[in-house]
């Protein structure tokens, strides 16, 4: 590999096997405090095989000063719920979609790149490192482009080793002749992936900018910029399945870097807008770029930049860049020009636009011309105008184009327009398609003289909701056909990527106020990918309603646990631990609802004689031959042509479906086999074998052995029928060779080997035979006999010679089995799917692989689905399982089909795959449906909402009616969405609009109501600015009504935007009012009670809100959020740095109520608190000042809390090595303070907030008094024994020294909530999980005891319950089983490095 190193390694790096900043201790602390327990990165045993993010933990034995590995984990309290990491669903927020072309045979390309790298390495000078290092140390004028240090690199003599024998050189011209494959690639916020695929190339540090560039005629590269300040060059191959990093470059500055490229695809520029930096790059080799020089605009902020289109030729190659910037609070236009012959010599022109506006976007639209968008207008700017100092530009307004989002040049569209409408478009030479933030898509056409005559036209294409970006499809056949009146492009709308086919017949030229109608000119839209929304909330719940057709969020879920993500645009149900493949229904044939079994043949695969008999003259027809039977007495055969078929609502015959009446031999008896050979039709009923010659004068032959067939199997002319109960087996060696007398039918019932076999079976009647080609000789066949407890293989040659030997036995317990090529697929008796590989006609040792999907309680059937896939289906589900394991593991990958919602009783009877056309023929109870397989996705459901521009929405799942309630706070509207199909029902919004106060929150109350069997009632609580409303929701007769039951008003105070409803139906809320510099805040507890309206009629009751408990306090700060665990309130302030506990809120009086600060990690800020049960809760915390982690999950348990002075403070359960620290804290005792006379003080304020204790309470039992007395004694102790006391932090403050109290934890050591801050022994968390991305939201499903964590990049982590045994030998897993991201291959101490790194999942490389 080739690299430029900027600095040396850390001095202790050679001690580290795989260095990391994660959890690194300060080196000086490590040297000074030798008794530190944890050294996760500095002391890793080099002989281990652990991953870098699975450090071994060591501690130092103080006796002999040796480091040893701990073998015993700490005992955990029984009340501590442990949640372990289970799985993740990587988020994929699409940003851009690029058309990609790459060679089908890409191995020569990789060899060429290695050859290019080898040539670079051979010619790399030794002085290069020193020169580059000195280059970055020189302080230069940032606006000087003549960089002499970079030019000096050309003067260095390149030395190479001429003695090496090199392989034959691969020429680039040979690679250009390789056939190309075209696909679309999506760049998300954290990775790249092919459209319709769930396999993502994960970019660990994120993506801030991207562009597709083609510096050669072989393959397209993707250039990515990262927020960390790195430029990556990515080569996607094999439909995006293979992704390679070719080169990275350290840009020297973090932040947002934008990429612009020239039309020749070899020159590109990186722009850092905030810092005003431009970096100029060039592909000097087909797959390698280099930095040419830099430009820094001092005291400037760059707004936009783009290349001017130029007449680029090899004889006169020149480049012009247009940049708009703010410099000294003025709008400045820059033009940078250079010639390719003198690439480092650039000329800079600038023009100050005194009355200019900030630019939103600059778009190259013609020769040396750019379209500049400002908030009020559009301007046409040319390079010549800026160079000559002109300040008057052609300006205009255009409403449809306001807020430009993306654009691309469209030469293929211009060719179509010139062919379809020559009189209008013949004079134009340039065409650009532009999209706006309002969803409008239009195109601009210009001519060479547009700058002079101002002749540019804008024409409408369409308008599409939620538009984020657009991209071309240059390889699409419709776009390549200039005579076609349609044009296809790709759009990203919300989280979906679609192909839109647009009609070019009726195009309207846009005026400045014209509005484009939604979906205008769209003739066909096709979704090719469904990814992730920018969700803000995650909801996890278990629905009491279970539907057979519903797909849950977890694969083996039997309790209908669901996860939903919410955003202002949509609600989405993700699949956490599996993938889905969407399907598209082509047709529904109701005529087939009387049948129970199907068999499908593609007519193009049948013999020509049979096609002629069917009346088909074309051998390449796409028609299908369908055999259907009701398994009793009705046998039919149909010919279906999908190109002529239309779906109708009634049961009349459908055009394109033909009933063939004279093809079957028997239409009245149950048929168990129908097949075709080259010469014959074979039909087998329960007692007869029919052989019907397709052509010629031969007559129909019947074979009836005289006993009933239990089943039949057939393969390539070999047919076997059997009845295990009767002990009868017969076979036909070659069915085409059977004569009229049936002499070639062999009966093995009297065979000595077969007779012995049936005797050994005893009462076992479940026997199945399968005929398969031999794995070592394809001309031979084996007969596999499947029994409940074993599998037997016999060569078919032994059947012919009557020398059967059943010694080749494999002990295997199976429920179902299928042999698909070299794979033996089975369902074991634990209902797991497993595969054994066949090698040399036997089971390959150690080849057993399984899938994680469990089919327990489901009647599963297997079907072959190609060479390497198996299809497994039940009454309501279809799975496709890959038979090759994932990488080097023993796990089989699979996906589930997303089937149409057809009701809870419409079951699947049969599935017949059409692999060539990617279709499935599925026989449902209501008929035959033909589905086309579409894209893979991680979303089970994605339903768009109304009013997507309204960002303030609340979401609530209502279990009783199985609906998602969506409350639009901005428009004061609400609706209910059925989660099975997304159908929305609007609710009466009058009660929301009658109240002018702001809507804050909505919750459901777990209250049982007297339900009418025909009605379902739900009680809701809605909080406004200063009131609460109790609302009854009633669902009946497909309508949902609502009414206000009761309301609760607050006087002179406002509610916090947070409500807590406990499982017992208790209501907790917080209100506050501002009093000078303080906030008077109150925690309130309400309960819902029943009141009789009429005392005589006891049944006539209503619900009322009643205040039960109220706790008022004063605070400098505001409570940010809180939750209730049992009867304890957990709260945090607006800064989120501290966490507080109010114990026994309901059972304590104001005088005895305590507020305790809980221990938090000093670098963490609370984001959200949620209870896990009556004892435990979890805190989502943000770690903003750390480089090694971004967030934490911190777990607390309330039953372990013991109140008292902390003389033995244990360290936090952190793998980062927090030790004991002796420090001070300060307390201001208020004037007139008397020990034992007051229970609650705000020691920071020195103000009294509650009344004195009653006289009946003895002071010696006062917990606060005991604590304060101990503090006073401790104060005297330190005054007598401390020779050098620490200075006071504030005047008039009494300094209190307390052992083992760190100011990092409690800076002011007082409760902001207004009570005496009590230091406790067990207020620290019992577990913490470090995460490498910021947390967006968390949600807990108590029914299945599972925690779901939504990260900022939309990745979802799943943590499941794992109650740990209290045994000494138990060793807990590090970080609860969650492994942080792998170490990046990008080295922070290198300026650049070129190579060939495979970024596929199995290679474990990441950037």
UniProtKB/Swiss-Prot annotation:
The modification Phosphothreonine is found at residue 1294. Residues 1-600 are annotated as: Required for interaction with MMS22. Coiled coil: none annotated. One of its GO terms (biological process) is recombinational repair. The keyword Phosphoprotein applies. The keyword DNA damage applies. Keywords: Cell cycle, Cell division, DNA damage, DNA repair, Nucleus, Phosphoprotein. It is found in: Nucleus. It comes from the Eukaryota. Its main location: nucleus. One of its GO terms (cellular component) is Cul8-RING ubiquitin ligase complex. Component of multiple cullin-RING-based E3 ubiquitin-protein ligase complexes (CRLs), which mediate the ubiquitination of target proteins. The CRL associates with CDC34 as the E2 ubiquitin-conjugating enzyme. The functional specificity of the CRL depends on the type of the associated substrate receptor protein. RTT101(MMS1-MMS22) promotes fork progression through damaged DNA or natural pause sites by stabilizing replication proteins like the replication fork-pausing complex (FPC) and leading-strand polymerase at stalled replication forks. Component of multiple cullin-RING ligases (CRLs) composed of 4 subunits: the RING protein HRT1, the cullin RTT101, a linker protein MMS1, and one of many alternative substrate receptors belonging to a protein family described as DCAF (DDB1- and CUL4-associated factor). Component of a RTT101(MMS1-MMS22) complex with the substrate receptor MMS22. This complex further interacts with RTT107 and CTF4 to form RTT101-MMS1-MMS22-RTT107 and RTT101-MMS1-MMS22-CTF4 complexes respectively. Component of a RTT101(MSS1-CRT10) complex with the substrate receptor CRT10. This is E3 ubiquitin-protein ligase linker protein MMS1. The lineage of its organism: Eukaryota, Fungi, Dikarya, Ascomycota, Saccharomycotina.
